[in-house]
């Protein structure tokens, strides 16, 4: 189980690829991976961005040894090699197939948590799955790395020069800070996710 391996600090590229190879069966349309951002998420696990910032200057890490190693691994996913990735460019007009995932033909699908609310929970209700039928796990750690590295999302809010609504801008920033820092607000938001969007204590 990937989550058990993660909790033990053993969820690595090699363990993930081992599972992927066991699961994948192209002749029966079974593929280990699907999703839009699979490549970027795996590259992030190297701990090196493709373009970095050093001493205030942009630098290319495209020739970094770990990124090259990751690219070599990703190349094996292709339909011309080990076929570990669902060939969405051939089968589904470049779109991930959530139906294939729901039918048990995809082992790992990379996506955002909001996709659960939009799509996956509906499959769960329709198929009457138990709470533990759907689970999330971080991307695996690069073998030999010192820790787990993941992509991050950063939001930025800019105040437009000449704007006449400075108070509204301040209120918006404050509301965002409050919702992300206040424990009571976070607890209420979590409960709303459970009540309205079918999240549960295991997700």
What are these regions (language model features)?
Residues 5-8, 49-69, 126, 141-148:
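Short, solvent-exposed loop/beta-turn-alpha elements that line the ligand-binding surface or hinge
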Residues 123-194:
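Extracytoplasmic/periplasmic substrate-recognition and gating elements
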Residues 12-19, 38-39, 67-74, 97, ...:
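Stable alpha-helical elements in mature extracytoplasmic
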């Amino acid at each position: 189980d990937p989550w058990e391996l993660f909790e033990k600090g053993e969820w690595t590229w090699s363990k993930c690829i081992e599972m992927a190879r066991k699961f994948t069966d192209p002749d029966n349309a079974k593929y280990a991976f699907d999703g839009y951002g699979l490549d970027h998420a795996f590259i992030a696990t190297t701990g090196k961005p493709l373009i970095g910032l050093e001493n205030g200057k942009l630098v290319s890490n495209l020739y970094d040894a770990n990124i090259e190693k990751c690219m070599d691994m990703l190349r094996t996913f292709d339909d011309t090699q080990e076929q570990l990735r669902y060939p969405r460019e051939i089968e589904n007009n470049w779109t991930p197939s959530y139906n294939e995932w729901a039918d048990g033909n995809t082992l790992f699908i990379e996506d955002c948590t909001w996709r659960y609310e939009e799509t996956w929970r509906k499959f769960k209700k329709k198929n009457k799955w138990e709470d533990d039928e759907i689970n999330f796990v971080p991307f695996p750690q690069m073998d030999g790395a010192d820790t787990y590295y993941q992509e991050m999302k950063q939001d930025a809010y800019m105040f437009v020069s000449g704007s006449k609504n400075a108070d509204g801008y301040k209120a918006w920033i404050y509301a965002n800070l409050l919702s992300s820092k206040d424990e009571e607000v976070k607890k209420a938001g979590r409960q709303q996710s459970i009540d309205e969007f079918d999240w549960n204590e295991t997700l």
